[in-house]
Amino acid sequence: MFRYLCLISLGLAACGPPAPAPILLFTGGGTSPGDVAALQAILEENHLAYATANSWQLNGITESRLTAYRLLIVPGGNFVKIGDRLTADATATIRRAVQSGVNYLGICAGAFFGGDSPYNGLNLTGGVRFGFYSAENRGIHKAAVPIADAGSGTLDLYWEDGPQLDGWGAVVAKYPDGSPAIVEGMSGNGWVVLAGIHPEAPASWRRGLIFQTPVSASRDYSLRLIQAALNRSPLPHY
């Protein structure tokens, strides 16, 4: 009996705890529940394993635990609230983890937060701070925007109060006014992809707007961004 228990113990020790999922999706304060759900749907449809973390969990995570993941995704929402719900220690931990090799995908609010936001941002951009896309100045808060991608031509993608990403990284896609809509680059040893638009947007978000690009093509584009960030694969750029 003792020998049997020892064998079980040794077997469990050899197996160890399960490896973490490769992707950590932030679901905490300030994130849009609808955007979290849209990203979860794409991850699950494409069999990409992921874990989630809310603000409390991210505030308590250690750098060694965070660096066990390959990619951190911060979705859309309110970048002011995202920063406010995290401690300065937490954002410093995330920054160190990215610069140690964790990759980062920031979508809309997540892109603002990835820059040098004054609201406890991550500053993965060496001090570059992003402003809103110019449509905001015309009183427009959501729109179907034709985005010129360097590799795949023009796609109509959903935009809602998102940033233009001028001043950092290689430009993957542009807004109609020529400002960057998607950028990529290194932050230390981490690969960073920032998007001012929402290619993951479901059909329900399109009501009242006119798109030339079908939802399926938009969601495929979202998957492409996720895989590029996860696998550190540079996208075609200008």
For each predicted feature, which ranges?
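Catalytic beta-strand/loop cores that center a nucleophilic Ser/Cys/Thr
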Residues: 139-205, 238
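Extracellular ligand-binding/catalytic regions of CAZymes and related secreted enzymes
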Residues: 21-23, 37, 95, 121, ...
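Short catalytic/ligand-binding loop motif for oxyanion handling, primarily in non-cytosolic enzymes
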Residues: 81, 113-116, 121, 133, ...
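Helical hinge/lid and interdomain linker segments adjacent to catalytic or ligand-binding clefts
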Residues: 25, 32-118
